[in-house]
């Protein structure tokens, strides 16, 4: 269920969209998002196109995703999963990687039903399981422990960034934030104005971390210019936290 714009997003990620289905309905079906009949139609279309995965250009609840995969007999991804995958490919700093992993684990945790063995293989060693504990419970407990550690690590990293902002404010320089949609040319603008050397690529979310450089204006005044992670339409609410560094810099 992809718009043409969404198809471009997935092509940039190396996917090969082979078919597209569009549906208009007043409200999503609570069980399958598209309704059982439409889901069966998509399953037939996927078989004919020999598709490995069906991507929905919207958010699916854990139950909807689970039900769809049973009907479609193949992986069903939603918009959040794709954006998280893009984030994971582009995260380079310690904070960026931690924030992406945190968002991924929060996304996976309620989707553990029926996927315990698969997730345990993705995560490596699990450790000692308690008596009578199922694989699903072990995976859930492992993810919860990792979430707690990531939250603690990010608290420390954000404290450091907060101190850096205070230091910049004490310098009495005005701060200018470059804000816009992803892949709109924000990093290119920063490089052109300041010679910053920030990585520039023709792909979504190439920048995930705020970068600040000095810029001397023609009148002689020096300002601090900050490049930020780009926004995207229909950003899933659970991913707003991943933009925290940008929102704090702009604020």
Regions found by a protein language model. Give the residues of each.
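Switch II of P-loop NTPase G domains
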Residues: 29-44, 229-251
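Single conserved hydrophobic/aromatic residue that forms the stacking wall/gate
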Residues: 1-6, 10
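Accessory, often N-terminal, substrate/partner-engagement and coupling regions
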Residues: 40-111
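Conserved G1/Walker A P-loop phosphate-binding module
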Residues: 126-130, 134-145, 149-233, 237, ...
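Short, high-confidence coil segments that cap the C-terminus of an alpha-helix
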Residues: 15, 49-51, 221
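Residues on one face of amphipathic alpha-helical coiled coils
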Residues: 12, 48, 67, 104, ...
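Short beta-strand elements in bilobed, periplasmic/extracellular small-molecule ligand-binding domains
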Residues: 11-32
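Conserved C-terminal guanine-recognition region of P-loop GTPase G domains, centered on the G4
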Residues: 60-70, 221, 244-251
């Amino acid at each position: 269920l992809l718009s043409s714009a969404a198809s471009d997003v997935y092509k940039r990620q190396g996917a090969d969209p082979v078919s597209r289905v569009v549906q208009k309905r007043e409200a999503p079906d609570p069980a399958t998002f598209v309704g059982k009949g439409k889901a069966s139609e998509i399953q037939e279309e996927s078989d004919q196109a020999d598709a490995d995965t069906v991507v929905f250009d919207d958010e699916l609840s854990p139950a909807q995703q689970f039900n769809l995969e049973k009907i479609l007999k193949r992986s069903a991804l939603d918009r959040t999963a794709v954006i998280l995958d893009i984030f994971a490919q582009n995260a380079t700093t310690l904070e960026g990687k931690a924030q992406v992993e945190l968002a991924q684990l929060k996304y996976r945790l309620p989707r553990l039903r029926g996927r315990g063995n698969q997730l345990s293989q993705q995560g490596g060693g699990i450790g000692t399981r308690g008596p009578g504990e199922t694989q699903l419970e072990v995976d859930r407990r492992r993810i919860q422990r990792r979430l707690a550690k990531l939250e603690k690590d990010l608290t420390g990293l954000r404290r450091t960034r907060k101190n850096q902002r205070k230091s910049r404010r004490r310098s009495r320089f005005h701060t200018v934030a470059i804000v816009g949609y992803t892949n709109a040319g924000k990093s290119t603008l920063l490089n052109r104005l300041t010679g910053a050397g920030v990585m520039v690529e023709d792909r979504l979310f190439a920048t995930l971390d705020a970068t600040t450089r000095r810029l001397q204006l023609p009148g002689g005044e020096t300002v601090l210019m900050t490049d930020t992670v780009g926004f995207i339409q229909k950003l899933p609410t659970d991913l707003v936290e991943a933009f925290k560094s940008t929102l704090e810099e702009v604020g």
